[in-house]
Amino acid sequence: MAKTSRRRFLAGSLAAAAGALSRPSPAPGEPPRTQAPAAPRFALGLASYTFREFDLDTTMAMARRVALGRIALKDMHLPLESSDAAIRAVIAKVKAQGLVPYGCGVVYMASESEVERAFAYARTAGFEIIIGVPDHALLGSAERRVRETGIRLAIHNHGPGDERYPTPASILERIDGFDPRVGVCLDVGHAQRAGLDPAAEAVRCGARLLDAHMKDVTAATAEGGPVEAGRGVIDIPGFLGTLVRLGYAGTLSFEYEKDGKDPLAGLAESVGYVRGVLAAMARGGSR
């Protein structure tokens, strides 16, 4: 896109966000709206899957270019079968670049040994959280490992066509009564593709919302594809406002899946859009 049209697009998007976040007088019977919006408690991060076509050094350099200081590593950047020494070396390398390697994922677990491997890997790396997809029959084993290690498990929804966890509700119903450190990684794109409102899904998850993947999609159907944040159909200002009101204190990681061989421009636009919406919220108040 030409610079002029990109600037116009972003200016228009941020103006719309500011308008959406303005505070009309409450209707009769509505509680008064907060005059000073709460500051976001969540941090922005990067799902390294965004740079799946690139090595770790390039991925770290790109994370720094868009000023995303927290990173969740996918196994192409830190293989699950790595030795303890290799894991520690990679983590030291990431930290030396000023990045916080807060988690890993998405990690699939289809056997008891894969559950054991995932948690051993995360413990060696010092990860706070695993973004994972354990088979249904392994949820009990995964919860036991959460209790033993203190590492949180955020189960990722993958939208229409996923037989395990298509929606956040499909996760929540299976972990009801589990340790509170077992929860959901809310992928807003896949939620929207399932015809769901990501903001409502965040509310549904409540305290079980442990991680979130930020993206946008072209349609609220199974056919919806990835697109730069702000260009698709997701109500991103509404979603961000909901995270703020919920007091969500985890990481909102960008998982930009478009343009796999050249993702930086689209990622940068997406990060800029989200930061612009957050700035508009801070200036204009909450919805």
Named regions from a protein language model:
Residues 1, 47-50, 106, 130, ...:
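Short N-terminal micro-motifs specific to bacterial/archaeal maturation
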Residues 2-43, 53-66, 123, 168, ...:
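Histidine-acidic metal/acid-base catalytic patches
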Residues 42-47, 71-73, 101-106, 130-132, ...:
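Hydrophobic faces of well-ordered beta-strands that scaffold small-molecule active sites
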Residues 47-51, 74-78, 106-109, 135, ...:
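Active-site beta-loop-alpha junctions enriched in small/polar residues
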Residues 72-89:
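Glycine-rich, proline-tolerant flexible connector loops at the mouths of alpha/beta enzymes
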Residues 80, 139, 221:
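Short glycine-rich, flexible loops that bind phosphorylated cofactors or substrates
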